[in-house]
UniProtKB/Swiss-Prot annotation:
The record marks 288 as: Interaction with the 5'-triphosphate group of PPP-RNA. Interferon-induced RNA-binding protein involved in the human innate immune response. Has a broad and adaptable RNA structure recognition important for RNA recognition specificity in antiviral defense. Binds precursor and processed tRNAs as well as poly-U-tailed tRNA fragments. Specifically binds single-stranded RNA bearing a 5'-triphosphate group (PPP-RNA), thereby acting as a sensor of viral single-stranded RNAs. It is found in: Cell projection, Ruffle membrane. Induction: By interferons (IFNs). PROSITE patterns: TPR, TPR_REGION. Changing residue 48 to A/E: Inhibits RNA-binding. Signal peptide: none annotated. Its main location: membrane. This is Interferon-induced protein with tetratricopeptide repeats 5. The record marks 33, 37, 41, 150, 186, 250 as: Interaction with PPP-RNA. Changing residue 33 to A: No effect on RNA-binding but changes size profile of RNA bound. Reduces PPP-RNA-binding. GO terms for biological process: defense response to virus; innate immune response; negative regulation of viral genome replication; positive regulation of canonical NF-kappaB signal transduction. The gene is IFIT5.
Length: 482
């Protein structure tokens, strides 16, 4: 096959609907963690589409440079199509064939790649698709939604759109409704702007109605009911689920989360340990265990007014060590798990291990391709570490400002603005020409809509540092709006 034909083939490949054309970037995930998770779901989560999981696993194998393993996964996907989707075999094969074509293309087996694009073209022609190599069908949109969801928070809105598109065609399809409900639940959970979001409550109820035997979707409904202060109703679902299952780690982990948030830490730990026996490499489970040990530690410290002694002090030290162990395990198993970094760093600080805390915070600050919410949280926690443990007020101010610049609407906003006002005012009492504090107050008052006060502080800062572009820009904006 000539170069021209290779270029032509590439143009056809780009038309296909499959994982290789859905803009799923490997920089946004920990490949080993996602591969591990998919493997666990294939083994233990019987309610999820095995076809979608094998197709996704093939793509992950390709991203790891394991194209032969990717082909084996696609063979597994084909077997599932024949076993479970024989009534729609050709339509359900389109994503798998697209992945085959791309893998063979990357292996320079161009004739094999062309064979699969030909199969796709024949189906599109047979079903009168307006596109030569693309067929609009809800099953493909659903599979796209699952793939996007697996690649993390940056993809949730696109996943939601994919499931919505599928539901337009089949509004009562059980699988489409599960995918949509879980995606909206994830969006509720990731949208941290103060109030509890409950957009997923309706979709979750519908998904449970359409899938009455699905424990996995029920546990999400229980957690959302807990979010909206209907904990008793949520617990009924949890109890019902636990009566029905024995060792489904993906259900146990969320049931444990329910009990952890209810402050029933021993019950949560019991379920987490049970799940961890089955899936010992789960970063989620390790993180949840760390959160339970941390909560128990906080309870003792509160009861002793932050001065535990004797047995209480020994127990606190033991809980800190346990929390560190599990947060560290979570971070090591998923290098993109931002909250595992901040929780581990904070726990090191709690135990007086400041150099270890500093090291983990610096690793967190170097994380790329994470959401703005995660960046916001990292800067906030590092600022607190600098303020209260390192006693470095200027570094704390810098990171509090960075947190607000990344995301100025969140539950942390009031804490951040209060901390900035307190620290900056204190520093100005000692040095009225402290330009960092002046500009920080200007930024905070501008954020709060106090434009005249903001302008006054920026003017003072600009007099000290007249070439600073940030101060000049802020002043111009303020003067034009006053």
């Amino acid at each position: 096959m000539s170069e021209i034909r290779k270029d032509t083939l590439k143009a056809i490949l780009l038309e296909l609907e499959c994982h290789f054309t859905w803009n799923l970037l490997k920089e946004d995930i920990d490949l080993f963690e996602v591969e591990d998770t998919i493997g666990q779901q294939l083994e233990f989560l019987t309610t999820k589409s095995r076809l979608a999981l094998y197709n996704l696993l093939a793509y992950v194998k390709h991203l790891k440079g394991q194209n032969k393993d990717a082909l084996e996964c696609l063979e597994q996907a084909e077997e599932i199509i024949q076993q479970e989707h024989s009534d729609k075999e050709e339509v359900r094969s389109l994503v798998t064939w697209g992945n085959y074509a791309w893998v063979y293309y990357h292996m320079d087996q161009l004739e094999e790649a062309q064979k699969y694009t030909g199969k796709i073209g024949n189906v599109c022609k047979k079903l009168s698709s307006p596109s030569n190599y693309k067929l609009e069908c809800p099953e493909t949109d659903c599979e796209k939604g699952w793939a996007l969801l697996k690649f993390g928070g940056k993809y949730y809105q696109k996943a939601k759109a994919a499931f919505e598109k599928a539901l337009e065609v089949e509004p009562d399809n059980p699988e489409f409704n599960i995918g949509y409900a879980i995606t909206v639940y994830r969006l509720d959970d990731s949208d941290r702007e103060g109030s509890v979001k409950s957009f997923s409550l309706g979709p979750l109820r519908k998904a449970v109605t359409l899938n009455p035997d699905n424990s996995y979707i029920k546990v999400f409904l229980a957690l959302k009911l807990q979010d909206v202060h209907a904990e008793a109703e949520g617990e009924k679902y949890i109890e019902e689920i636990l009566d029905q299952i024995s060792s489904q780690p993906y259900v146990l982990r969320y049931a444990a989360k329910f009990y952890r948030r209810k402050n029933s830490w021993n019950k949560a730990l019991e379920l987490l340990k049970k799940a961890l026996e089955v899936t010992p490499t789960s970063s989620f489970l390790h993180h949840q265990m760390g959160l339970c040990y941390r909560a128990q530690m906080i309870q003792i410290k509160k009861a002793t007014h932050n001065r535990p002694k004797g047995k209480d002090k020994l127990k606190v030290d033991e809980l800190i060590s346990s929390a560190i162990f599990h947060f560290k395990a979570a971070m090591e198993r998923d290098s993109m798990f931002a909250f595992a970094y901040t929780d581990l760093a904070n726990m090191y600080a709690e135990g007086g291990q400041y150099s270890n805390a500093e090291d983990i915070f610096r690793k967190a600050l170097r994380l790329e391709n994470i959401t703005d919410d995660h960046k916001h949280q990292i800067h906030y926690h590092y600022g607190r570490f600098q303020e209260f443990h390192r006693k470095s007020e200027n570094t704390a101010i810098h990171h509090y400002l960075e947190a607000l610049k990344v995301k100025d609407r969140s539950p942390l906003r009031t804490k951040l603005t209060s901390a900035l006002k307190k620290l900056s005012t204190k520093r100005l009492c000692h040095n009225a020409l402290d330009v960092q504090s002046l500009s920080a107050l200007g930024f905070v008052y501008k954020l709060e809509g106090e434009k005249r006060q903001a302008a006054e502080y920026y003017e003072k800062a600009q007099k000290i540092d007249p070439e600073n572009a940030e101060f000049l820009t802020a002043l111009c904006e303020l003067r034009l709006s006053i």
